[in-house]
Amino acid sequence: METDYDVIIVGAGAAGLSAAQYACRANLRTLVIESKAHGGQALLIDSLENYPGYATPISGFEYAENMKKQAVAFGAQIAYEEVTTIGKRDSVFHITTGTGAYTAMSVILATGAEHRKMGIPGESEFLGRGVSYCATCDGPFFRNKHVVVIGGGDAACDESLVLSRLTDRVTMIHRRDTLRAQKAIAERTLKNPHIAVQWNTTLEAVRGETKVSSVLLKDVKTGETRELACDAVFFFIGMVPITGLLPDAEKDSTGYIVTDDEMRTSVEGIFAAGDVRAKSFRQVITATSDGALAAHAAASYIDTLQN
């Protein structure tokens, strides 16, 4: 069976780059295709503190660079293109991108997830003009300004801490009366003198003329609304899996791809790893584990095709 590669990995986050390392170690011809920047969600981590083996925390960016260097050193090729379709004919996968086409005997989908949108007035209108989903990327534009963070989970807390080093006016808006983040991150957030939390509050609208100037808030207990002046709004209210390339694969009730313990999807020859798959806990370490398992399973699958 003649193909360009043994395995093509879609996505160069922690799961994809881990899969690339293990695929290459299994002597598979490996291509990683990434439409944006390698690193995925890890790039948003200001300080990676809970990854085994790193006694001294490193930034998500540094971690991503290390992962890429390892994958390339093992022999992986990385193409920065956007995959448009994945098809299968006679046990061969055909992957098309905006600039070319490739064939492979197996595919590992490591496309991850993207930030959930609220769909409220002003959110899309002010994107890039005060509305953002990445504090690490856009925070420096609002140095010494008043910024609002929407959410109460790990991402919201972590990004609020990032912003607190750029400004002393960070206001978190959370619809509940306690943070949902891991205890250590939540405690660090609440102790930060530059971060204030408005509890039991929802965001109703983002307002402004040419850029963000305020937000409309609602007290979930009383129904009372009020306006809060600010310069930027950062949204961290959860993630949505990126599964459009695999519409026929089995998914759970929230849209994540269902796999078995070896990362096999319901489509033979396609494996899923990282935040795109259904699981109870999503961290960098679980993504890298998924990637290793997916590569191992892909190698076993290819063996069955060749023997």
From Swiss-Prot:
User: Which cysteines bridge via disulfide bonds?
Assistant: C134-C137
Q: What is its main location?
A: cytoplasm
Q: What is its EC number?
A: 1.8.1.9
Q: Which UniProt keywords apply?
A: Cytoplasm, Disulfide bond, FAD, Flavoprotein, NADP, Oxidoreductase, Redox-active center
Which compartments does it reside in? Cytoplasm
List the Gene3D superfamilies hit by this protein, alphabetically.
FAD/NAD(P)-binding domain
| Source superkingdom | Bacteria
- Keyword match Cytoplasm: yes
Give this protein's Gene Ontology molecular function annotations.
Answer: thioredoxin-disulfide reductase (NADPH) activity
* Cellular component GO terms, alphabetical: cytoplasm
InterPro entries assigned: FAD/NAD-bd_sf, FAD/NAD-binding_dom, Ferredoxin-NADP_redctase_2, Pyr_nucl-diS_OxRdtase_2_AS, Thioredox_Rdtase
Q: Which GO terms describe its biological process?
A: removal of superoxide radicals
- Which NCBIfam families does this entry report, sorted A to Z? TRX_reduct (TIGR01292)
Q: What PANTHER family does the database record attribute to this sequence?
A: THIOREDOXIN REDUCTASE 1-RELATED-RELATED
The protein depicted here goes by the name Thioredoxin reductase
Instruction: Tell me which species this is from.
Output: Treponema pallidum (strain Nichols)
Its lineage reads: Bacteria, Pseudomonadati, Spirochaetota, Spirochaetia, Spirochaetales
